[in-house]
Amino acid sequence: MSAPAVSQGRNVVVIGTQWGDEGKGKIVDWLTDHAQGVVRFQGGHNAGHTLIIGGKKTILRLIPSGIMRDGVACYIGNGVVLSPEALFKEIDELESAGVQVQNRLRISEATNLILPYHVAIDKAREAKRGAAKIGTTGRGIGPAYEDKVARRGLRVQDLFDPAYFAERLRENLDFHNFVLTQYLNHPALDFQQTLDEMLSYAGRLAPMVTDVSAELFAANAAGKNLMFEGAQGTLLDIDHGTYPFVTSSNCVAGNAAAGAGVGPGQLHYILGITKAYCTRVGSGPFPSELYDADNPARQDPIGVRLANVGKEFGSVTGRPRRTGWLDAAALRRAIQINGVSGLCMTKLDVLDGLETLKLCVGYMLDGKQIDILPRGSDAVARCQPIYEEFPGWNTSTFGLKEWDALPQTAQAYLKRVEEVAGIPIAMISTGPDRDETILLRHPYKD
């Protein structure tokens, strides 16, 4: 037997290094000028990627950001959990705006489905937790991953065998209805209604369903470049994030291999996205936090300014994001976990006009100084940030496209981030439009 073909294309993984919302969508869109395919490998429609193209705003939740580039193939890998209802809503919105989707989107047959009972359980659990809620989006992501790990999940491929799907659905619904009615005080879901709804999606899904793993291998062997688009961020990773205030999937670069069905040797460059400051949505520790709309004790004027100027509201939930200074110690943890090759800093322009900037370079934890984010949310919550201060700049960086055009103080700040992080900054985003970007090192070329 001959050996498998060696990958001829170059592949880039784009991941968030913070708590999500780093601006990955715009960067993926920008880089797909050099890619022929973009792959989602984890998460569901709980992640919103916002793109501004020609002044027009588009929010993508499930479909890869490459869909906004003509001719780019888009893939949903086996590591994603898929809501057909949410998918078709997104497809219809895009196609009504003139974007071709269904003939360019490929969905892994092994992708697990989000069913109505997953959504019901997600919402009912959060309501029951009250003040101790995790801060899920209530879209069924977590319960769908639970079923996957428990080996009772239903996959896309199961929709094409109605008898088998009905049998498995009845078993699952018996289990989940017991949880809903006996523990979560929620009405039971109807079997026939759920079955009819799910099977109604099969016909429209069928042309898009394929062996994504095999298609990606073939594309690479033919010399095509691929982009693996992460959702959420490293600090929300189920294993490496501030557990239990995390999402339900692995958001780190290594999961691009498992979640898309490619070998780890096919991940050639890891681009880590970080804002010039930090944000977080929902509950959980945040050492460099300045502002939380729901916490009267966290109302620092600079944090409020970051939220307002940066328009920090969740693209999916609409919830106000908490804001704080850039945390380089947390960034260092993310770089190590992901094996980041280069950084892209986004929203630098939001810092314009600040008299003084602060950069968290470490923490005091239980009387000891540490220089990397610790494991576990309890330890993170006890961290007191150690800051370095930098002079700000009064001139605008918005829309700049060359390094030399940046103010000297902005350059000094960025160089210090590089020093503390230990890796180079490859790109700087200076605005929401795809062209408002400073390129220092090209992930597909350097």
Swiss-Prot record:
Plays an important role in the de novo pathway of purine nucleotide biosynthesis. Catalyzes the first committed step in the biosynthesis of AMP from IMP. Homodimer. GO terms for molecular function: adenylosuccinate synthase activity; GTP binding; magnesium ion binding. This is Adenylosuccinate synthetase. It is found in: Cytoplasm. It catalyses: IMP + L-aspartate + GTP = N(6)-(1,2-dicarboxyethyl)-AMP + GDP + phosphate + 2 H(+). It comes from Ralstonia pickettii (strain 12J). Its EC number is 6.3.4.4. CDD domains: AdSS (cd03108). Its cofactor is Mg(2+). InterPro entries: Adenylosuccin_syn_GTP-bd, Adenylosuccin_syn_Lys_AS, Adenylosuccinate_synth_dom1, Adenylosuccinate_synth_dom2, Adenylosuccinate_synth_dom3, Adenylosuccinate_synthetase, P-loop_NTPase. IMP binds at D21, E22, G23, K24, N46, A47, G48, H49, T137, R151, Q232, T247, R319.
